Structures are given as structure tokens and as C-alpha cells.
């Protein structure tokens, strides 16, 4: 029997608008309780923190996510690691949060966050967000299958971490 609490890694896609509309007193507390529950079970949570930075500079520790509430909440409230990809970064919290560090240059290919999570047989949690509203896991599958309608595009974004220049993507 597979239960979410048996997971070592959970990749979370979320949309908390409905939860926040129903829980007006302190909606963030519910999210914090959920994340702390998972961490206490030894689960590493990985969350999209996409900034879509295609030009200029991306600061791993400072650039805010444009992918909703959860990543920015985690970056404010938890000790986290964030991947260095300027468009499609991820934050991770928990025992094995370093899984998102030092990823490859491809957002969806070999040595991407998706690739690493796949190798770890991770669980996937769509929280209040239907799969029909999009999911980048599909892009990983497309890239590793070399579909003919996808192509690589490079952007000249400078990546910084802890005030140190890492590279240009």
C-alpha cells in the first residue's frame, strides 16, 4: 500500500487560492503545518520557484518566484536550497534538500531536478491544482524522448549565489 508518508521526496504543484478563500483567519498556518508534518516524517519537499528570468541577472537567494505562493513562502519561513536555473528553479526543504543543488544547464533534460526526482522514485502531489492546468513534468518526458517539436534555447542571464557569480546560462 502506497501512502504519501512513505515518500522520501514529494514534488508539490499547488494553487492555494481556494484554501485561502475558505480559511481567512490564518491561511499560511495551514500550509506551514502541512510542510512541517512532511519534514518531520523525513520527507524532502520540492517546489517550483520559477522566476522566468531570461535576461539580466538571477540571484538564487533573492529573486522571487513568479510561480505562486508556495515557493516564496518557503523561502521566507524555512531553511531551503534553491536550484540555480534562472527560468525554472526549484526550492527544496527537508532532509535531502540538496537534491536541487548543482543541476545541469537543461531545465528538463539529463541532471535536471525532474531527472533527479525520477531516479529517486519521488511522489507527486498536485495540491488544489488540476493536472489539466499544466505541469512541467511533461516537458522532462518530452525532452528525454527527443520529441521533434521541442528545441533548446539559450538566454544570456547571469546567475549569482551568495553574491558570487556562478555562470551565464
Where are these regions (language model features)?
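N-terminal and secondary-structure boundary signal
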Residues: 1-169
Amino acid at each position: 500500500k502506497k501512502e504519501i508518508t512513505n515518500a522520501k521526496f514529494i514534488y508539490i504543484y499547488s494553487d492555494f487560492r481556494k484554501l485561502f478563500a475558505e480559511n481567512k483567519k490564518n491561511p499560511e498556518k495551514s500550509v506551514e503545518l502541512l510542510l512541517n508534518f512532511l519534514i518531520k516524517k523525513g520527507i524532502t519537499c520540492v517546489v517550483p520557484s520559477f522566476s522566468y528570468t531570461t535576461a539580466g541577472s538571477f540571484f538564487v537567494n533573492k529573486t522571487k518566484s513568479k510561480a505562486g505562493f508556495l515557493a516564496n513562502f518557503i523561502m521566507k519561513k524555512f531553511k531551503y536550497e534553491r536550484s540555480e536555473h534562472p527560468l525554472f528553479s526549484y526550492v527544496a526543504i527537508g532532509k535531502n534538500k540538496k537534491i536541487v543543488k548543482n543541476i545541469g544547464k537543461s531545465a528538463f533534460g539529463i541532471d535536471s531536478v525532474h531527472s533527479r526526482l525520477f531516479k529517486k522514485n519521488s511522489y507527486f502531489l498536485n495540491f488544489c491544482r488540476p493536472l489539466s492546468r499544466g505541469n512541467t513534468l511533461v516537458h522532462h518526458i518530452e525532452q528525454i524522448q527527443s520529441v521533434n517539436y521541442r528545441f533548446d534555447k539559450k538566454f544570456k542571464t547571469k546567475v549569482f549565489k551568495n553574491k558570487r557569480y556562478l555562470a551565464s546560462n
